[in-house]
């Protein structure tokens, strides 16, 4: 219960000031990881609707719990923190748009089994026209709206597998005192052609956010520590540059803005905007 509540609370906190009537972005402005999160939501809708249809509330609870812990807290919400905390504009609104859609659907799903909690969440959710005052009067979400094709799901299963291998190498680097927090790291990924094409399909800044490191470099060929992903080697070193006091990433652009000597160029531009 606490995991479900905390997931909702985190999302609500990051929707402060978000107006779904004016701030939602179009689907083509969502980042791929936002689309992945919505696809995971669609899978949850399929599973919970099937559970409710046969009164299998245990199945519903476990599906919701796994979604909140594995898909949201341990992955999506963790990866999107940099966008939410450190940027303005479309990138941040894209994450908020996905999170808003996720929480609206999730709250409807839990309403039959967590009545008071779901209404408490609903009271704090920003509303659009036509939404009921009470969540129990809302229709259950229908599957298909956020469904992704199998190729997209397979791609992201591979990306998550790569991320898991990077995390292993970062843990080793942490044990060797090479780095402390993961944002102190710069990661080099040695790839065969297939893995290179997979990773290169994601913008490098988004790939770094996915790994929660300051820098990612792709290299064709062999190198680094062997991994469970075929055609992938991983190496980690301490990132060059200094730590930005705002985003905590390491960058060689620290101090490039005279008015903000402790910020990276990105954060300085956001603060000045």
Segments from the language model and where they lie:
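Short cysteine-rich clusters marking metal-coordination/redox-active sites
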Residues: 244, 264-267
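Acidic, turn-prone loop/beta-hairpin segments
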Residues: 18-49, 77-169, 173-197, 216-235, ...
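Residue-level signal for inorganic ion chemistry
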Residues: 4, 72, 115, 170, ...
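Short linker/helix segments within small regulatory modules
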Residues: 253-262
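Core structural elements
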Residues: 2-12, 32-43, 62-83
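Cys/His-rich metal-chelating microdomains
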Residues: 250-253, 270
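Short metal-coordination and nucleic-acid-contact micro-motifs, chiefly zinc-binding Cys/His arrays
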Residues: 240-243, 260
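Short helix-adjacent coil turns
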Residues: 48, 52-59
């Amino acid at each position: 219960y606490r995991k479900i509540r905390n997931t909702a609370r985190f999302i609500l906190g990051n929707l402060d000031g978000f107006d779904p009537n004016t701030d939602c972005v179009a689907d083509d402005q969502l980042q791929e990881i936002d689309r992945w999160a919505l696809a995971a939501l669609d899978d949850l809708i399929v599973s919970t609707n099937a559970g409710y249809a046969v009164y299998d509330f245990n199945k519903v609870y476990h599906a919701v719990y796994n979604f909140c812990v594995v898909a949201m807290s341990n992955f999506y919400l963790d990866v999107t923190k940099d966008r939410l905390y450190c940027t303005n504009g479309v990138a941040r609104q894209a994450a908020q748009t996905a999170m808003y859609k996720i929480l609206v659907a999730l709250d409807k799903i839990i309403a039959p089994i967590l009545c008071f909690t779901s209404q408490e969440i609903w009271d704090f959710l920003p509303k659009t026209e036509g939404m009921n005052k009470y969540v129990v009067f809302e229709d259950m979400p229908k599957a298909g709206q956020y469904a992704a094709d199998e190729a997209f799901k397979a791609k992201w299963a591979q990306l998550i597998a790569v991320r898991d291998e990077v995390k292993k190498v970062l843990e080793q680097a942490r044990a060797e005192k090479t780095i402390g927090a993961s944002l102190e790291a710069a990661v080099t990924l040695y790839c065969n052609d297939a893995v290179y094409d997979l990773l290169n399909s994601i913008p490098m800044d988004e790939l770094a956010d996915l790994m929660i490191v300051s820098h990612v470099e792709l290299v064709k060929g062999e190198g680094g520590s062997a991994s469970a992903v075929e055609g992938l080697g991983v190496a980690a070193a301490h990132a060059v540059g200094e730590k930005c006091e705002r985003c905590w990433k390491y960058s060689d652009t620290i101090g490039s803005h005279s008015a903000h000597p402790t910020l990276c160029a990105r954060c300085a531009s956001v603060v000045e905007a």
